[in-house]
C-alpha cells in the first residue's frame, strides 16, 4: 500500500509541475482489482512524451528529475498482474491510470 501512496503523491506533484490547478485522484476497488486514476487540467503531454513516458530515465524536465516515477508505476502495476496507461491532450491535461490486480 505504500507504493500506492507514493504513486498518488508523485502523480499529483507531476500535475502541479505541469501547471494544473485541478487534480482529480480516484481509487476504485472491484473485487481484487484496484484502479488508480489521476487526472489533471495541466499543460498536457506531447505525443512523443506519452509514447516514452514509461521508458526508464526519460524526462522532459531539465532539473532534479530522474525519469523513474512513471516506470516505477508501471513496474508496480505489472508486478501484480495489472497495467498502466496515459491519455493526454496537449493544452488540456493528462490522465494516468493504473490497474493493480
Label the predicted regions.
Residues 1-26:
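Conserved ATP-binding N-box helix of the HATPase_c
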Residues 28-36:
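Short beta-strand-loop-beta element adjacent to the nucleotide/active-site pocket used for signaling
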Residues 40:
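Acidic ATP/Mg2+-coordinating residue in the GHKL
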Residues 45-56:
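Short conserved segment of the HATPase_c
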Residues 58-66:
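Glycine-rich ATP-lid/hinge loop adjacent to the conserved G-boxes
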Residues 72-82:
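Conserved glycine-/histidine-rich ATP-lid loop and adjacent helix of the Bergerat-fold HATPase_c
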Residues 86-90:
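A short beta-strand-to-loop motif within the catalytic HATPase_c
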Residues 92-94:
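Glycine-rich GHKL/ HATPase_c ATP-binding element in histidine kinases
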Amino acid at each position: 500500500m505504500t507504493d500506492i501512496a507514493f504513486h498518488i503523491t508523485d502523480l499529483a506533484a507531476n500535475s502541479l509541475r505541469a501547471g494544473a490547478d485541478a487534480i482529480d485522484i480516484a481509487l476504485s476497488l472491484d473485487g481484487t482489482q484496484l484502479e488508480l486514476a489521476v487526472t489533471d487540467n495541466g499543460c498536457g503531454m506531447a505525443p512523443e512524451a506519452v509514447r516514452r513516458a514509461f521508458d526508464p530515465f526519460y524526462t522532459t524536465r531539465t532539473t532534479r528529475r530522474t525519469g523513474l516515477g512513471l516506470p516505477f508505476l508501471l513496474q508496480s502495476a505489472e508486478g501484480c498482474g495489472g497495467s498502466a496507461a496515459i491519455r493526454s491532450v496537449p493544452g488540456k491535461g493528462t490522465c494516468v491510470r493504473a490497474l493493480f490486480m
